[in-house]
UniProtKB/Swiss-Prot annotation:
Glycosylation sites: 81, 269, 371, 404, 443
InterPro entries: AB_hydrolase_fold, CarbesteraseB, Carboxylesterase_B_AS, Carboxylesterase_B_CS, Type-B_Carboxylest/Lipase
Signal peptide: 1-23
Keywords from the named record: Disulfide bond, Glycoprotein, Hydrolase, Serine esterase, Signal
Other remarks on this protein: This esterase confers insecticide resistance.
EC number: 3.1.1.1
GO molecular function, one term: carboxylesterase activity
Source organism: Myzus persicae (Green peach aphid)
UniProt record similarity statement: Belongs to the type-B carboxylesterase/lipase family.
Cystine crosslinks: 89-106, 266-277
Transmembrane segments: none
Function: Overproduction of nonspecific esterases is a common mechanism of resistance to organophosphate insecticides.
Catalyses which reaction(s): a carboxylic ester + H2O = an alcohol + a carboxylate + H(+)
Protein name: Esterase E4
Amino acid sequence: MKNTCGILLNLFLFIGCFLTCSASNTPKVQVHSGEIAGGFEYTYNGRKIYSFLGIPYASPPVQNNRFKEPQPVQPWLGVWNATVPGSACLGIEFGSGSKIIGQEDCLFLNVYTPKLPQENSAGDLMNVIVHIHGGGYYFGEGILYGPHYLLDNNDFVYVSINYRLGVLGFASTGDGVLTGNNGLKDQVAALKWIQQNIVAFGGDPNSVTITGMSAGASSVHNHLISPMSKGLFNRAIIQSGSAFCHWSTAENVAQKTKYIANLMGCPTNNSVEIVECLRSRPAKAIAKSYLNFMPWRNFPFTPFGPTVEVAGYEKFLPDIPEKLVPHDIPVLISIAQDEGLIFSTFLGLENGFNELNNNWNEHLPHILDYNYTISNENLRFKTAQDIKEFYFGDKPISKETKSNLSKMISDRSFGYGTSKAAQHIAAKNTAPVYFYEFGYSGNYSYVAFFDPKSYSRGSSPTHGDETSYVLKMDGFYVYDNEEDRKMIKTMVNIWATFIKSGVPDTENSEIWLPVSKNLADPFRFTKITQQQTFEAREQSTTGIMNFGVAYH
């Protein structure tokens, strides 16, 4: 009898071990709302990491939740399948011009980790990186940006998030009914979720760095100055944009929301009726209505985006960004050498330069987004002529003056607002602010996405190129030559050292001088060159035209 019991016991133990070992091939994590099962991926150089995709961090913003601030995620029964990404939020497909993609149920995030807590015998928690995607607040999704370069040799937990876009994310009635900024409040909800749950993935909630490029950079800067986001992160990386860029704060959002209500056959005089009616309309139709505010070639950048909230119990943006005090944490800010090149390339497609020459006064206010800033038509047209004379003299817009067009867009849309943000944060904070200009141009660029023939290695890096050397961008070029791989290591090192210590590239700390706290001092920054060298530089300005302030 004893032998029989022993045999049965061993058999049960074997079966139990077999089931446990088999189950262990599927990584599982317990978060506050339930259990999730993920999968595996491999980094650029073949390191195996865990991935948990499409995790809901808030309730679906559908039906009565449409236009509401994000609502708490509801617990689920069973095991959540986190091996496939969640849907992108409704927006315009990049490069398509007008195609609407995504779903309204879209508030998901993705978590990547090199090791889970049970594998970490020392019990040390890892630094956390949260990436907020760009896309003008009307396109993009978190899954497009992966940590496959960052996690090659670094033990970080990486999170990417989705948030509501366009009208569904940023409509406002200008009062307490629909206060606006729901897309940014989604991001806050994601940051709160991370505070509650990231330990389950081995992450340290007290060491969170938020990053973003373009509208993602604007988002990061907005979190840096929003009282709603205080205490949710410890460092910030801002790439190619800021809350001070003209496109970052949308104008006349309440008026635009009423216009959409009228377009959808809804009342326009009562905010409650506007919102109730719009909740009954097809989500894709509302998302597509965004295009009514981009009259030429998807300009202006952001008809709907962050807006100052005039009412509400808790405001994300209680005042204009320039009047808000930033949280006192280390900040790393950057800009590409030729931010405007991607836009001048896009504008030159399909006879665009001729259209621009023939309709300069009409198109320029939309390209540079001062169509609302300067309401007087005569003054608006005069400003257009002043700008043309400043950048082009008496020359027409053409392939020969494309660099002039790039410079104009760089100055107005990125250079002024980004450098101003760096100076503002540095002047207010005790923590250091670092600024660098990315000057390396490799085998691939965003420019090649629109016009491959116009791009060649060493041309000039443009908007978004820098990010592709830190985060693997889904569907884009994979760098496979020695120089580009070297730049990946360089950029990853800059980020990694900043994430760990609040100081970038600690081996060359004498070159990384913080931005001066005195606004009267020359602007200090580090230049990353085509030869992959670092140069400490100072300028009285960052190259932005002096009269640019007048129409900012």
